[in-house]
Regions:
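Short, isolated positions in well-ordered beta-strands
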Residues: 13-15
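Short, hydrophobic/amphipathic alpha-helical patches that form generic packing surfaces
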Residues: 42-53, 78, 82-85
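Charged interaction scaffolds used for protein-protein
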Residues: 1-7, 22-23, 30-33, 37, ...
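Residue-level signal for threonine
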Residues: 18
């Protein structure tokens, strides 16, 4: 899956999602469809979720500080939504994947 590499104050951060981190933000109320209508709630959840997989030791204040330094926030948030959706799509799979188990209705 894709990720974002971000350097802040000479430290690299890798932002990405896993099913676990996507689940964490969903349980806290994240809905990607509401990023545009409730940005004050959804964007901090989305950004937090992107950091959790590889940087779970970061406190929310530090995550906010790093996010505040981002250039092109709109494109950045849209890319995070894309990364989140990639993770969600892994639950649906692809029927063409070799080695997938077949199922049938009985």
């Amino acid at each position: 899956m894709s990720a974002i590499k971000y350097n802040y104050k000479n430290r690299d951060y890798i932002l990405e999602f896993s099913r676990r981190t996507a689940s964490i933000i969903e349980r806290n109320g994240f809905r990607y469809q509401e990023v545009g209508t409730q940005p004050n709630v959804m964007i901090p959840l989305l950004v937090y979720g992107a950091f959790v997989k590889n940087h779970s030791n970061l406190k929310q204040g530090k995550i906010d500080e790093i996010y505040d330094s981002v250039k092109g926030k709109n494109a950045f948030v849209m890319k995070l939504v894309e990364l989140y959706l990639e993770t969600v799509n892994t639950l649906m799979g692809d029927d063409d994947d070799e080695g997938n188990v077949n199922w049938e209705e009985v």
